[in-house]
């Protein structure tokens, strides 16, 4: 069977796929239909955070699958409640809403912020400030929140009520707060699709202070950098701020679709019965996977992330053909002299899977990738950058 032809015939043309059909994997290794082995540094775009077919994760998921796969949010289930407890205890947040994706987590964050602001200040205080170069999802509202025009074309009109601030410019943020009737400021502490660009610590702390002074909510989008990838449990923790709302997804359930919106003290009770919902959100199987993930993201695991990050930066900074390395933890962007797409293709030929963010290589390896496999992959990247 020609899988690629079948896909091209029946799947909507929304993806420019690489010419590879992946059929199986184990840990940080995957194999294509011809039996070729690859070291995977993309992990399904930061989803398979313990790699493919992780034994502990599979055991947790299959145990739940044999008990109850779905029942809806009309009933109580243990995995959903236990996962919410874990998230709150590990972050200091108060309540959780579960959806299925990062876009859904951000939609909930936006709804919660607007309802809080309307309840407290009035309906007109609905504007949410996001950052230029940001990415918050592909629904009409999260596209509106995304501060990149390239994603807006063909889908106008977008949801109203968003304005965009210059990253790392507190004066511009203060100006927008003064000029608009605002509910919240929403940011990724590391802009992923925007080129793996971490915000300055002084800016994030300054933004949090501006929110406090102006009675605005601070929303941190942790969809990609969250769940241990930064070397902390969540990326905002590296900046020493406490958001009012946190959105996360991708690696949360280790490979299953799950999004979460964490609500802090100010907004913990803003959503009441009927104000929001999800058919699949909090699915028991997905929650079982996420419980396994969170229970394993201990200090030793996070120190391992930091060590792997330091190794990659040490090896690639100053390497031939490498202009610079950006990012945090195991979410790294590599600026190269050669075209990034050409390097990605060359790496793939040599058995290493990497992806792009704007004009950079984007590295998103499993948090527990064996050091020998990581070293081999980085050697290939260096060779392809230099060649």
Set out the residue ranges of the language-model regions.
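Conserved N-terminal phosphate-binding loop of PLP-dependent enzymes in the Aspartate aminotransferase
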Residues: 1-387
């Amino acid at each position: 069977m020609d899988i690629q032809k079948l896909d091209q015939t029946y799947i909507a043309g929304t993806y420019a796929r690489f010419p590879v059909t992946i059929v199986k994997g184990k840990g940080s290794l995957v194999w294509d239909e011809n039996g070729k082995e690859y070291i995977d540094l993309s992990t399904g775009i930061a989803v398979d955070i313990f790699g493919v077919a992780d034994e502990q994760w599979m055991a947790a998921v299959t145990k739940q699958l044999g008990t109850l796969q779905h029942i809806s949010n009309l009933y109580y289930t243990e995995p959903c409640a236990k996962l919410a407890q874990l998230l709150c205890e590990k972050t200091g947040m108060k309540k959780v809403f579960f959806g299925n994706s990062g876009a859904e987590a951000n939609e909930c964050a936006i709804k919660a912020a607007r309802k809080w602001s309307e309840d407290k200040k009035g309906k007109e205080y609905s504007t949410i400030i996001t950052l230029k170069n940001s990415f918050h999802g592909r629904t009409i509202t999260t596209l509106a929140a995304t501060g990149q025009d390239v994603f807006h074309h063909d889908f106008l009109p977008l949801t109203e009520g968003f304005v965009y601030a210059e990253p790392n410019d507190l004066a511009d943020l203060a100006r927008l707060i003064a000029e608009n009737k605002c509910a919240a400021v929403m940011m990724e502490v590391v802009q992923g699709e925007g080129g793996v660009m971490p915000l300055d610590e002084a800016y994030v702390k300054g933004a949090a202070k501006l929110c406090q002074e102006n009675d605005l909510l601070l929303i941190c989008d942790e969809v990609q950098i969250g769940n241990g990838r930064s070397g902390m449990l969540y990326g905002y923790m590296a900046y020493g701020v406490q958001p009012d709302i946190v959105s996360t997804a991708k690696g949360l359930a280790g490979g299953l679709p799950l999004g979460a919106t964490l609500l802090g003290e100010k907004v913990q009770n803003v959503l009441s019965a009927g104000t929001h919902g999800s058919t699949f959100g909090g699915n028991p199987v997905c929650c079982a996977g996420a419980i396994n993930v969170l229970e394993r993201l201990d200090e030793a695991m996070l120190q391992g992330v930091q060590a792997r990050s330091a190794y990659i930066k040490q090896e690639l900074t100053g390497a031939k053909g490498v202009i610079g390395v950006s990012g945090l933890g195991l979410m790294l962007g590599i600026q190269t002299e050669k075209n990034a797409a050409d390097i990605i293709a060359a790496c793939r030929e040599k058995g290493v899977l990497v992806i792009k963010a704007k004009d950079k290589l984007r590295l998103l390896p499993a948090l527990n990738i064996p050091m020998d496999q990581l070293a081999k992959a980085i050697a290939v990247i260096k060779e392809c950058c230099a060649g």
